[in-house]
Every structure is written in C-alpha cells, then in structure tokens.
Amino acid sequence: MDLNGDAGAKRKRSSIVPAERPAKHLKPESSALTPGDSTPANGTVYDIEDEDDASRLLPIGPAQADSPEWQATIEEVVKSVVSIHFCQTCSFDTELSMSSQATGFVVDAERGYILTNRHVVCPGPFWGYCIFDNHEECDVRPVYRDPVHDFGILKFDPKAIRYMNLTELKLQPDAARVGSEIRVVGNDAGEKLSILSGVISRLDRNAPEYGEGYSDFNTNYIQAAAAASGGSSGSPVVNIDGHAIALQAGGRADGAATDYFLPLDRPLRALECIRRGEPVTRGTIQTQWILKPFDECRRLGLTPEWEATVRKAAPTETSMLVAEIILPEGPADGKLEEGDVLLQVNGELLTQFIRLDDILDSSVGQTVRLLVQRGGQDVEIECQVGDLHAITPDRFVTVAGGTFHDLSYQQSRLYAIATRGVYVCEAAGSFKLENTLSGWLIDSVDKRPTRNLDEFVEVMKTIPDRSRVVISYRHIRDLHTRGTSIVYIDRHWHPKMRLAVRNDETGLWDFSDLADALPALPPVPRKADFIQLDGVSQPAASEIVRSFVRVSCTMPLKLDGYPQAKKTGFGLVVDAEKGLVVVSRAIVPYDLCDINITVADSIIVNAKVVFLHPLQNYTIIQYDPSLVQAPVQSAKLSTEYIKQGQDTIFVGFNQNFRIVVAKTAVTDITTVSIPANASAPRYRAINLDAVTVDTGLSGQCSNGVLIGEDGVVQALWLNYLGERTPSSHKDVEYHLGFATPSLLPVVSKIQQGVMPELRILNMESYVVQMSQARIMGVSEEWIEKVTQANPSRHQLFMVRKVDCPPAGFDNMADTFQEGDILLTLDGQLITRVSELDVMYDKEFLEALIVRNGQEMRIQVPTVPTADLETDRAVVFCGAVLQKPHHAVRQQISKLHSEIYVSARSRGSPSYQYGLSPTNFITAVNGVPTPDLDRFVKEVSKIPDNTYFRLRAVTFDNVPWVVTMKKNDHYFPMSEYLKDPSQPCGWRTVSHNKSKHKDGIAPDAANLNPDAMEQGYDGASDIEPEAE
C-alpha cells in the first residue's frame, strides 16, 4: 500500500511543487535550546496550494519610517497582542502532538478573550500560556475552536495581569479594502514582537489548501504583501485606525512576500455569541464551495441571463460560488453535483461565503432551498441543514496503545468520503500498522464491524489481554486497498481503556475509564512442522531450519537510547528442552518488553529475557517448550573458533523472512567495536571478533548462522545497531558473524540452572599493530612473544576509553587509563579478544601494561554486569528518566547525577521547556537530587500547574537551569519498576493517586514510545519490519 503520495482529494492540482507552496505561520517551539545542544524544531509545518496571480499582487518597496499616525496606532495595538506558547498533548484529527508558538490578540479585556487561529487552539487536548507586551504571563484555555474556519478563542484571567492596563482590539471586518495599508503585529519568526507592513491586494481569494493537514474552506481569504513567517499565526491585521480588519493565517513559504488573512465576519459573530453566553451554532450541508470567476462559470453552463442578473445586483462581484465537493451520505448527496453554480438560497440571490454561512448557521435542523444552475438548466433542491459540531470529534479513546476517534468532517472533506468510521489518530502499540503514524480507518476488529467509535469500544471490551485478533482497515489516502492484519492486543502495559471528552467549560479534556482489561486466556499447546528446503544440496542447511525461531519484541517505553518501539528478527534455539533461544541484542535490547516467538511459522508463544550480554550483542530468551509440539532441534555449537579462509555454509534470513543458503568461505576475522552514536548513547557491541564471509547474501541477511558440513554451528550471524548518520539521520545496522565458542560458557551455566553473574573490565579497547606498539614503548621482547603467541594476527590491545564510574565516585588510580597498552592479565598474554574472557569470574585482575612508554603492573577491578542493566524508569512531565545506562558510562567522562533524561514526548512540558534527552538533572528548586529516589521525593512536593526549577547538565558538561510548569492532568508522574514477581517482570506505579486510586499508571498518550525522541536529531528512521 503506497501511503507516501499526495492526498487524494477531489480538487484541482496546483502546478507549484510542494517545496514552493505556502505554509501556516506556526513557529516550531525552539524548546529553549540548552547550552551546547541543538534541539530540533518540533512544530508541524503545513504546505498549502497556491492560486496566486502575480499581476494582482501589490508588493511594497523597502520599509519606510512609519508616520506619526501609524506610530501612535502601533503603540496602542501592541498592548493587546500576546505571544502564545502552546502544546497539543497527543495526536488528534489532522494534527500530531506538538509544541509551538503563535500570536493572538485580546478582543475582550473584561472577560479575557483572545482571538487566534484554529490551528493554534488545536482540535485536540491543548495546554499553553500567553505572554503580554510587558512580559506578564498567564495561562490560557480554549473556549471555542471553529469546526471549519481558521479561528479559535482562548480565555485568560484578566485579574492575573497586574502591571498593565488591558486593552482590546475592535473587530472591524468591513474595513478591509483593496489598496488599504495594513500592519501585521505579532510573534513573527518566534520573536517577541514584530511589526510587518503591507498592502491588501485581494479580498476574494479562495481559502488556501494546507496539504494533508487542517485546511480552511467555504470562506474567502484576504491576500496581501507582508512577508510574515513562522510564529505570526493569529496576528491581528490592523489598519491605521487601530482596528483589527483580518486575522493572519498563512503565507508563502518560498520567500515571496505574500500572506493570507482570514476575514473577521465569522470570528466577530462567534465572539458575540460567547459574550452573550449562547452556543455558536454552525450549520452545514456537507458541501465545499469555491469562488470561480464568471468566465469559468460560463464554461460550466451559467446562462447570460443569470450572469446579467447577478452583475446587475452586485456590480462589483467578479465570481460566483460553485460546488466543488459533495460528501457522500451528506444532506446534499444526490441533490447537488460538482460544478453546480449557486444562484439563490431561500430565494435570495447569493454570491458570497459570508451570507451563505449566515443562512446555514441560523438554520441548523431546518430545511433550506437552493437554486443552482447545472449545465445551463435551473435546478432547485431542498437540503436539511446539519450540525457542524456534531460531525467534529470532541472525544477520543485510548486502548492497547492506540488512540481513536470518529472520522472528522475535516478528513472527510479532504478525501471526499462519508463522515463516518473509526479513525486512528495515533497508530501505536497494538495498532501500529505498516509504520504509519496515523490515518487508518478501522473497518472491523475480531471479525466484527466497527462503524463508529461506540461500536469499536464495545468490541474492544470483549477482547482479552494478549489475544491475537484479525483487523480490517484502510488508509484514508488509499481507500481502494483494504488491509488485513493480525494484531496482538496489549492490555497489560496499557491496562486501561480511557475515554477523553472535551470540556469547553474548563478547557481541559476529562478522562474516564471505560473498562478494565480482561485477563489473558491460558495458552494452549499447538502442533506444527517445519518447512522443507527444496533444491538445497547441503543437508546441514536443511537440518538447521528446525533450530530457528522468529522473535518479535515490542517495547512499551523507550529506554537506554534504543530508537524503536518494535523489532523483529530470528533467534537460534540452543536448548529445545528448556526453550532457550539466542537472539541479537539489536532485536531484544532490554527486558521491559513483550517477546513473542513464532515456531515453524505456525506456533506463537510468549518468551522472557533470561540474560543480556553487556558487550557481545546477544540476548538469551526462554519460552515454554511444553506449548510447542513441533520437532524443534537444539543447535550444536562448535567449541573451536572458526578460522580465516575456512569453508562454511551461510544460512540466513532475508528481508522477506525467507531462508537463503550459500556455500562460502570466511574472508576475515577482525577485532571491532561498533561505532558510538553521538546524538544519544545506546547499547553497542565492543571488544568483538567479527567474522565476515565471501557472499553477497551476508549483507542482505540480518540473522542466520555459519555451519559446517557436519551441521555444527560455527558462528551466529547477527545484526548490530550502530550509529546514526548525521546527514540522513538514519541508523546504521551492521551484519557480522559471532563465533560460538564465546557463547558456550554462558549457555552452559543457564542450562545448569545458574544465572551467569559476569564481571567485565570497564574499558573499551582497539587493536594496535606491532609498528605502533614499538613506538609507544613496547619492548622487542614482548613483540617477539606476541608474534609467537598469535602467528595469524600480530596485535595487542590499547585502551580507547575507560567507562565512567558511578556518580559520586572519582576515577580510581589503580585502573586503566586511555592509551594504556595491555600486555597480560593474570599472567596471560592478551592478543585475542577471547582471551579477555578471563575477566568474567574475577573481582580483580593483575594487569601488565605499557603506560607512557613504561611497563607497570596494576590491579584492576572488574564491574558486576548486574549493575549495568536498567531496573527503573520514571516518567515525569513527559520525560523518561533513568539511571545512566552502560552506553552513557562508556561515552562520558563524568556522571553528574544518577538522573539521566533518556527520552521525551512531543507536546509535553519537557518538550515545551527544552529538557532535552541526554541531559542530567542535578537539583530541583535548589535541592540536590543525586538519584531517582530523591528526585521523586522533591517533585512530589510541587503542586500541579506550578513552575519549578531544574538544574541540569548537558552531555557536554555545560550546566544550565530550566524552568518548567508541572502538568499532572495530561502528564502525571509514573514509574516502571523491575519486579520478577510480576508476569511481565515489571510493574507500574502512579504518583498521582488522587486521580488514580488503584495506583496503576494511567494509559496516556504521553507514554506512547512512538511519540518520543531520544536525541537532538529526532526519532529513528529505521522502519520496523512488517509482521
């Protein structure tokens, strides 16, 4: 299914390429860049189509000094203009979760109403604040967002502004005229205040099309040359009298000084209704109209008689309203047709959007009569006027990690489809379909239809945890193609099914629990058989098929810098009786996860993590073999190291999960360390002998084995997660072989029922050749010993980096230093990586090294690996906090605290105020917080919706202070704690027990791992494999 094309909307295509299209003027939140940081832009950019006629622009020359009249006007206007900083906390309808800046202006100083754009007020959960000209700040909440037109109204408390006299701008929509000189006063380009001048060139422009996001329609727009940019959305367009005559909405993004303003007729009506305490009625017949000039209308069949009548009644008019899109199943379906020219409504000659809106808004639930001309024939129809608010979603449901609501009128109009269906606005968790964040329509779940949100909820209530059900779906961009998938319903990491309903009284979205999760059904043993390899001449390859299982790992939270929420690959069964499987740690990076194993492409069973190797990129997992009635075979692992030039058989799995076989030879065995990821430290293999082979299949296959003719496995073929490239922001993945003898000691202990408690040297090394070693002070005697001990590779190991000790501990004197050349450990000459294995069982090792040209003996401590794995995570204000994991200690020289920011959610306070991943938190409100316990204690004292100070240190050792506002409503604090007594191995705890008395962490959009970023270059671009 191709989901990367343009929106399939029924509208004319612009000849302008997307890069040249205009855009809305949101200013992506800079996230208060930390010293030494380069936090990415995180707003949403909207491209819009353009229908400019260059001959109609009235560009202005270089800015001249304003006249005294304009200066006096601006001095008064700026007192009413505010800078709005806001977030949409979760994806909803046309918008993704985001943080951004825009502009608004006070339109009622007594009641505290601010007018701004609808794309600022947001269709979904909103939180934000505004800053006045004198830098006073106050919270704002939404009062009204129009279902169609690009305006909304925010409310603030006038009593909160104590140091300036509030003033308001009068709305005067009838003062907008072609040739009028105007000023756009706002937060242009994210600046506190910018004043841009321009001249109105058009009053009859059709509403700009903003691509696949929100777009205004059924209104005319005003066009001017003002050159506004990001952050000016919602700015007042004022005339010399100081009256607001339009609302800044969008403009060209290609550098042309062209801007688009919304007329204020409908905002003025909405404001007056709100002032009177009346509902803002909005009527619709689910039809999009556009303005077309008389010459086009004549081609559509407008008769000369009607043209003469219209021109006589409205001499200044040059265009008429023409039906562009009629939604199926809407009031006008089967009555109006595309291309109908509107003549009259209720007997009144009508050529303008404003009057059409007037009639429809005052006729909700009533019938209107429309006279249109179709191909030269008069056609009169009657339509029932529907309620526009009724087809605009004001609620959503979160379940199994995904977020859903009824399909909106905005999306229906964009794609010309009926306004019904269940829309996936946040495709995550169980409902992450085909690596697309949103846009799915769910047709059925578990073979039951889901025509609307209520039906979907009722179906989901009946599905037990850990069930696998069939869902049928389509993407809104490609409704011709129906997809069918089997999804794994996760109700243990996401136990609550929660309903959020918009509350226009409070400006918040109220959450309620719909149903608890049904417990998982007990697993049932299944039978299966393995495939037979046709045409494969190597019997050993045919046998090894029975030792492979497919492994799928899903992470409910991003930890340890791992960039994905789901990964799939293959593992090798090393003990079929005990259900032990070895898999790459690039597939199972940590144990806060769900693991599903597929045996013989038929049987699916759950598995758990048994062992994570800290250095060599493998994880051992275990499934219940009693559930698998299939001839699974334990792979035989070689006890001898594979050698360069040795013949071998490569057996791997390609990108289609199909097994491939090739007879080949070992080209090289090289000591490597996977490159570190600069933007966000994450697990990587180091001090590793990597096997490469002479076949092109090795690069295509991420998992497999190298086996001999006797069927003995000589090496595992694993994928290794590497660095992210600065240019493409894509993660590099290496495919290398790992010799099995290094695996045997760990597997043997686990088979004996003993959990390996390895110890490691806290350093990373790399190979030095004898020419380098000689220059660095290694004696000829030792060089001779090296050549005799390892005839195939004359090498020693130099310390590249020493791991940072825990916070509060200084580097110990008797340990390695960068640049040390290692000669022996406990008297054994070290020329191979495998010889470093002596470190695993000893607390101290006696090392002979060459440092600064001098031989010396030191006693070096080893580090217990049990302390390196993450066992706790705190989610606070959208930031995932954890103890610095091993990769952090490998890449940093000093730990500033035990509180490391691992990730943050879009639309959260952490995102808004710039608490970036890879930062360390050292204090809260001046109180030192060296560890998570102290941090949780201090932040628990902070009341909701209150500012507090965090002292932080960047990864590059630059201290700074961030001020944040706590938001417990959308981002309550919760914890993930490792607990072997729990079925998942972890438990969740909420610190917001006043609202969640059961103590279980709430299922909230801020815990969606796909909405989290982990480094200053954003989220991963590696696409997870399709199931």
Swiss-Prot record:
Residues at the active site: H119, D150, S232
Protein name: Pro-apoptotic serine protease nma111
Pfam families: PDZ_1, PDZ_6, Trypsin_2
Listed Polar residues bias regions: 31-42
Region (Serine protease): 81-265
Gene Ontology CC annotation, any one: nucleus
Family: Belongs to the peptidase S1C family.
CDD domains: cpPDZ1_ScNma111-like, PDZ2-4_Nma111p-like
Principal cellular location given in the protein's record: nucleus
Keyword match Nucleotide-binding: no
Record-annotated PDZ domain positions: 288-373, 875-956
EC code(s) of this entry: 3.4.21.-
Region feature Disordered, mapped onto this chain: 1-46, 991-1027
Subcellular location: Nucleus
Species of the source: Aspergillus oryzae (strain ATCC 42149 / RIB 40) (Yellow koji mold)
Key words of the record: Apoptosis, Hydrolase, Nucleus, Protease, Repeat, Serine protease
Gene name of the record: nma111
Its biological purpose: Nuclear serine protease which mediates apoptosis.
Record GO terms (molecular function): serine-type endopeptidase activity
Domain of life: Eukaryota
GO biological process: apoptotic process; proteolysis
InterPro entries: PDZ, PDZ-like_dom, PDZ_6, PDZ_sf, Peptidase_S1_PA, Peptidase_S1C
